[in-house]
Design a protein with these regions (language model features):
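FIC/Doc superfamily catalytic core
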Residues: 1-144, 148-219
Length: 219
């Protein structure tokens, strides 16, 4: 929740995110005021991750992808905009990084084709997921929140396919965006960034496993 929202511009710190998760409170004494949507989208991210785990045995579908978006954007200022279409595909054209994305009237067809391509893959690898993610972000199916939805899908599909999951933290942010931007010319940059993030995530797992084992020894 912290990393994915952080690279999208959330001003919540890691400690603040942990505080919200553990206490469900939003008061931060003697600290900078935080936009309400940052709070809402962070708490929504916790719910979205629970949904991710609850549906982990189901094949990826447009229904699941749309539900990620609905959960993430419910209660935000965007949800009050009549054109925003929370939990469904965009009604207005948008762009990412100065590049045009899929036209609204073409999104449903393009998402169907993307889903069919992905489900036809017999051996999903980190390369498959990189291509899926790039295609998804090129379509940019939602009015906003595409990056967060796309990264939740990446994490989910890593778990489903026995691949080390990862999060794109602030240190990987620029490499990640460059990898998406240059994917047509070279797939290696995005894949390499994802693999680097996997190494970080694996080191977290090892650290917490060691802490857990040390705790059990003390007990």
């Amino acid at each position: 929740a912290y990393n994915s929202n952080r690279i999208e511009g959330s001003r919540l710190t890691e400690d603040q995110t942990r505080y919200i998760f553990e206490t469900r409170l939003i008061g931060f004494k003697d600290q900078e005021a935080v936009p309400v949507d940052d709070i809402i989208e962070t708490t929504n991210h916790f719910v979205a991750f629970d949904f991710l785990l609850d549906t982990i045995d189901e094949p990826l579908s447009e229904t699941i992808i749309k539900e990620f978006h609905r959960i993430l954007k419910t209660g935000t200022a965007d949800a009050l905009k009549p054109y925003f279409n929370v939990g469904d595909y965009k009604k207005m054209a948008n762009e990412v990084g100065g590049k045009e994305t899929c036209k609204p009237n073409e999104v449903a067809n393009e998402m169907q084709k993307l889903g069919e391509w992905y489900l036809s893959q017999t051996n999903v690898s980190i390369y498959t997921l990189a291509e899926y993610h790039w295609r998804f972000e090129c379509i940019h199916p939602f009015q906003d929140g595409n990056g967060r939805v796309g990264r939740l899908v990446l994490f989910r599909e890593c778990l489903r396919n026995g691949i080390m999951p990862f999060v794109i933290d602030n240190e990987h942010k620029l490499f990640y965006y460059r990898g998406l931007y240059e994917f047509e010319q070279t797939t290696g940059f995005l894949v390499g960034t994802m693999q680097s993030a996997q190494d970080v995530y694996e080191s977290w797992i090892k650290y917490f496993n060691e802490e857990l084992l040390d705790g059990l020894k003390i007990d």
